[in-house]
Amino acid sequence: MDGEGHDINIWGARMSPSPAAAPVSATRGAPWSGCEGCPSRAADRRCVCH
């Protein structure tokens, strides 16, 4: 599943253009706040840390 890595990059760039805003939004008391690798909700589904 090499496409998985590409999917995360595409989602991260589409949802959060700024890498700094990504972690901040995820830490806003969200269900995926424990996942620092997931910049957006869409990426959370592909992220291993649910």
Curated annotation (Swiss-Prot):
<keyword id="KW-0588">Pheromone</keyword>
<feature type="modified residue" description="Cysteine methyl ester">
    <location>
        <position position="47"/>
    </location>
</feature>
<dbReference type="GO" id="GO:0005886">
    <property type="term" value="C:plasma membrane"/>
</dbReference>
<feature type="propeptide" description="Removed in mature form">
    <location>
        <begin position="48"/>
        <end position="50"/>
    </location>
</feature>
<keyword id="KW-0488">Methylation</keyword>
<comment type="function">
    <text>Activates B-regulated development.</text>
</comment>
<feature type="region of interest" description="Disordered">
    <location>
        <begin position="1"/>
        <end position="32"/>
    </location>
</feature>
<keyword id="KW-1003">Cell membrane</keyword>
<keyword id="KW-0636">Prenylation</keyword>
<feature type="compositionally biased region" description="Low complexity">
    <location>
        <begin position="16"/>
        <end position="26"/>
    </location>
</feature>
<keyword id="KW-0449">Lipoprotein</keyword>
<dbReference type="GO" id="GO:0005186">
    <property type="term" value="F:pheromone activity"/>
</dbReference>
<feature type="lipid moiety-binding region" description="S-farnesyl cysteine">
    <location>
        <position position="47"/>
    </location>
</feature>
<keyword id="KW-0472">Membrane</keyword>
<protein>
    <recommendedName>
        <fullName>Mating-type pheromone BAP1(1)</fullName>
    </recommendedName>
</protein>
